[in-house]
């Protein structure tokens, strides 16, 4: 299973971003692949929060269009919504403890726990996820998995 970060969805959605074409193609391939594509609820909510935010985009995505984008992604063959399971809290605590997380690191540890709990590879344009030694992750455009 592969799990994607908020930034992957934002880049794939926003045609005004220079990364759009690469990430749009990537997300379309992942969503229609045989390998499951894990979509944590918090990532989906984060996507809607970012793309509809007037402080982030001069012309934000309308809430209706953002919800439609999520619905279309969830309807894709490989898409799987992920919710915290029985091991999520412990994985989250371990990841946070490993890096002495505070502030924004807490949110990243929480997201990384979805991948850890589901034995998945985390895909993010944020190379800061490398600090989580237990996490298997890769930059979406690199192709090289890091442990």
Swiss-Prot record:
Q: Which residues bind Mg(2+)?
A: 5, 108
Q: Which HAMAP family match?
A: VapC_Nob1
Q: Which Pfam families match?
A: PIN
Please state what the protein is called. Ribonuclease VapC43
- Cited InterPro entries: Mtu_PIN, PIN-like_dom_sf, PIN_dom, VapC_family
Free-text function comment from the UniProt entry: Toxic component of a type II toxin-antitoxin (TA) system. An RNase. Upon expression in M.smegmatis inhibits colony formation. Its toxic effect is neutralized by coexpression with cognate antitoxin VapB43.
Cofactor annotation: Mg(2+)
Enzyme Commission no: 3.1.-.-
SUPFAM superfamilies from the entry? PIN domain-like (SSF88723)
- Domain of life, source organism: Bacteria
């Amino acid at each position: 299973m592969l799990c994607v970060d908020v930034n992957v969805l934002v880049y794939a959605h926003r045609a005004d971003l220079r990364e759009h074409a690469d990430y749009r193609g990537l997300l379309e391939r992942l969503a229609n692949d045989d390998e499951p594509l894990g979509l944590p609820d918090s990532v989906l909510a984060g996507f809607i929060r970012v793309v509809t935010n007037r402080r982030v985009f001069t012309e934000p995505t309308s809430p209706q269009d953002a919800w439609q984008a999520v619905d279309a992604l969830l309807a894709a063959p490989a898409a799987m919504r992920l919710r915290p399971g029985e091991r999520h809290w412990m994985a989250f605590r371990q990841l946070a403890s490993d890096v002495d997380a505070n502030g924004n690191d807490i949110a990243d540890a929480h997201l990384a726990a979805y991948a850890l709990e589901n034995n998945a590879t985390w895909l993010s344009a944020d190379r800061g996820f490398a600090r989580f030694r237990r996490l298997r992750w890769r930059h979406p455009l690199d192709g090289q998995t890091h442990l």
